[in-house]
Structures are given as C-alpha cells and as structure tokens.
Amino acid sequence: MSRIQNTFAALAAQGRKGLIPFITAGDPDPAKTVELMHALAEGGADVIELGVPFSDPMADGPVIQRSSERALAKGVTLHSVLDDVKRFRARDQKTPVVLMGYANPIERMGADAFAAAARDAGVDGVLVVDYPPEESHDFAAKMRAAGIDPIFLLAPTSTDDRIAAVGQVASGYVYYVSLKGVTGAANLDVSSIAGKIPAIKSRVPLPVGVGFGIRDAATARAVAEVADAVVIGSRLVQLLEQAAPERAAAELAGFVAELRVAIDGAAKPAA
C-alpha cells in the first residue's frame, strides 16, 4: 500500500478521521516551507497538501491567489517545491505529502520526468486541478507506476458519470469541494455534504476528504462527522499571511492542533 493508503487504513482502524492541511510552497518565505511542513505534522496533520504556485490559479480564492503570487515573486518553481519535499523527507518518512496545483508546470517538465522526480523526492500524491478525470487515464497510470496516488476533485455539481470517471482513475483519496466557487468561500452546509457522500462512495471506493469553507475547529468537527477527512487551506494561508515571521510555525502548529482535537472529538461516539 502507498503511504496515503496506509495512513487512511490506520485512521479507519482507530475510528478516527483524517486532517489534511494545505499551505502554498514558498509562502511566506521559501526558506521556511520545510519548517512549516514539520509544524503541520507536529500539530497533527495526517496528510500534507503542498500547493505548487501558479500564475493563474483559477480554482483558488483571493487568499491562495495572493500566496501563489508571493511565492512566484520569490522564485518558487515546481523544481524547488520537489526540493522542499526531499528536505522534509530527511526528517519525516511517515507523513504523506500531496502536491496540489495546475497542469502547466507539470506539462512543461513532462509527465514521465515529473513522475520520476516526484517519486525520488518522496511525493505521495498529486492533485492537478485542471485535469478532468475523463482525459487523465495516461497521466494517472504514469503516477501510479511511480507509486504516486492521482487524486481528483469532485463538487456538488458533479454528475454520477463524472463521479464514476473519477472512480476509474483516482487512488489514495478523493477531494470533495463542499461549495460551488473558489477556495476560501463561506456558508458551509454540512447536511448537503452528508447527502452527497453516499453517491460518491457508491462509485469511488476511496476515502473522501472534504474541503472549501472550513475555517475553524467547529466547522472542522462538523465536517468530520460526515467525511473521512477534513481539508483546510485558505484559513492556514491567511494565518501565515498575518503572522509575525518568527511566530509563524508555532502559530500554525497550534491552530492545526486545535483542529486535531476537534476532529478526534467528532470521530468518537458520544459517551
């Protein structure tokens, strides 16, 4: 099994739900990315999603767009992100790392070269926002051949056919976007999430992580009641945007630890 599959199997055996935080590589400081990844793990992350900055992040709201712009201005590239993962792996061989980004940087490198470089760096999964599942069979096969789980997005508007298409190519987990629109939006409706997950589970035999609109421990706990994992990104990127540089890692770890406690509370039956 892959590192991601092992992680979710262990969570299921413990009756726990996963916590998947997202940060943008290189923001606020390229020299601090590995330190921040360790802070996420120390706070209780089960999987880390590491954003690869891109100049036109169409699925992202203003908070993550700004973080991408800052990282690009500081020279962050797909190659430097892979270097960050390699340096993270020198100390942490347990926590899965998923790269989340857009097709253009991968296509410039070439899928085969990317798969080899990502494998060698210690990447466990890749989520390419603008790769539709129906057109991703070759890419997904190349990733799996390198031991990397191809992860795909589903949304409230996803049809049964689209869900089935994801089921044919995805591994590791699927990321259910709980809101229409862009990352960081508000107005989370947990009951609508709960209503959609059975349709996903019937066609995709993978854990379902839910993200978009999760901003605090209370919403994380509510989502953890109905999902296999909680994905949180914009709130963490905003925290890093506002934190004093010398306090960023500690504040990040502390906030993730609060989410961890809340999610673990959701996973346990009431006494």
From Swiss-Prot:
User: Which pathway does the record list?
Assistant: Amino-acid biosynthesis; L-tryptophan biosynthesis; L-tryptophan from chorismate: step 5/5
Q: Which reaction does it catalyse?
A: (1S,2R)-1-C-(indol-3-yl)glycerol 3-phosphate + L-serine = D-glyceraldehyde 3-phosphate + L-tryptophan + H2O
Please state the Enzyme Commission number of this protein: 4.2.1.20
Top enzyme category: lyase
Q: Can the keyword Metal-binding be found in this entry's annotation? A: no
Give the transmembrane region(s): none
Q: Where is the active site?
A: 49, 60
Return any one Pfam family short name.
Answer: Trp_syntA
Please give the function described in this protein's UniProt entry.
Answer: The alpha subunit is responsible for the aldol cleavage of indoleglycerol phosphate to indole and glyceraldehyde 3-phosphate.
Subunit text:
Tetramer of two alpha and two beta chains.
Which PANTHER family does the entry link to? Answer: TRYPTOPHAN SYNTHASE ALPHA CHAIN, CHLOROPLASTIC (PTHR43406:SF1), TRYPTOPHAN SYNTHASE, ALPHA CHAIN (PTHR43406)
Q: What is this protein called?
A: Tryptophan synthase alpha chain
The organism of origin for this protein? Burkholderia pseudomallei (strain K96243)
